[in-house]
Amino acid sequence: LVSEDDSGKWSIIIEEGGMIAMKFTNGYWQVREEITPLYAAEYADCRINGSELTVYAPGKHIASRGDGLNLGMLTVHLTSPMEDVIKVSVRHFEGVQYRGPFVEVAEENPNVRIEETEEEIVYQSGKTRAVIDKRPGSWGIRFCNGDRELTSTGFRNMAYMTNRDTGRHYTVEQLALDVDEYVYGLGERFTPFVKNGQTVEMWNEDGGTASEIAYKNI
């Protein structure tokens, strides 16, 4: 998932092996010359406020006080709008005023459990769990339902990208997709219903087949 700052647009890219390389890297490992990446490298700290969990993820392993100098950080918020659903928000520079787009969300007040051990933090709503890895240099979040892992984010998956040539900034997330696992739907578009291998742009007001607003976006 790629979001450009202040544009209100998300690009959902579904492909095995990390297609986001086409926008920010040459191949899988080499970062394009004009891109400055900030990857979530490890868990640093957290705050619990009622049913909200805030996790701080610096851009590199913090072994000493000096490692915290001139270093960016991603702030990850976990909340639950309804039972069995976990909402994850990734932010950078939270002091900037949010200018929208604003969408009203009908939220409930589910029972949320937050448990912490030396190696992980578990955020649970109903049967759905987000498990945050606390081990040094081992950033990752696993999303599970019961005993089944649904997806995960890990090494170089969550990032904040800056294009130095254009001055544009992007928030990026890559979620694990297993072999023979498919993504369906994503709105009224004249493309195959199975969206694997496609790039799908999502707007709050996305053109439908006969109106300005697509009513089938999921």
Regions found by a protein language model. Give the residues of each.
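A low-complexity, Ser/Thr/Gly/Pro-enriched, surface-exposed linker/loop concept
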Residues: F24-S64, N70-E119
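Catalytic and substrate-binding clefts that recognize carbohydrates or anionic sugar/phosphate headgroups
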Residues: M22-T25, G68-N70, R91-F93, N111-I218
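Short, Lys/Arg-enriched N-terminal segments with co-localized hydrophobic residues
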Residues: E4-A21
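Terminal low-complexity, poorly structured segments
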Residues: D6, G18, G27, V31-E34, ...
